[in-house]
Amino acid sequence: MAKKKIEAIIKLQVAAGKANPSPPIGPALGQHGVNIMGFCKEFNAKTQGMEPGMPIPVEISVYSDRSFTFEMKTPPASYLIKKAINVKSGSSKPSKEFIGTITRAQLEEIAKVKDPDLTAADLDAAVRIIAGSARSMGVKVEGV
């Protein structure tokens, strides 16, 4: 069987279990002729066990015959950090105003979740990557 030619790669962030044909999903998939409801049903089925509303980055490969496949990534580090310290948004002045404190244990948990998407050599390197993200959000980092 010949390999199908990829026409487009669409990158979106979709809330777990809440994919529907409204923007931004509908227009992004519609312009490539993809079955929007097919994607929504498949995505919602795959994210059924996840926390509802958690943003999931998804990469959709659209083929020349208008079929598609998609790959889900891990939730953004910023979302996981905000969830760990129970805040709604990052600091407006990250280096001056701190919105909370995160411990090494919490950073390790986040690094384990993010591990498949990170290019870190080991857990310690992954923790440092997540710590950098936390600092850029205005979170005080302890133990790193």
Swiss-Prot record:
Pfam families attached to this UniProt entry: Ribosomal_L11 (PF00298), Ribosomal_L11_N (PF03946)
GO molecular function: large ribosomal subunit rRNA binding; structural constituent of ribosome
GO biological process assignments: translation
Segments traversing the membrane: none
Role: Forms part of the ribosomal stalk which helps the ribosome interact with GTP-bound translation factors.
HAMAP family per UniProt: Ribosomal_uL11
PANTHER family membership: 60S RIBOSOMAL PROTEIN L12, LARGE RIBOSOMAL SUBUNIT PROTEIN UL11M
Subunit structure: Part of the ribosomal stalk of the 50S ribosomal subunit. Interacts with L10 and the large rRNA to form the base of the stalk. L10 forms an elongated spine to which L12 dimers bind in a sequential fashion forming a multimeric L10(L12)X complex.
Name used for this protein in its record: Large ribosomal subunit protein uL11
Protein species of origin: Francisella tularensis subsp. holarctica (strain LVS)
Gene: rplK
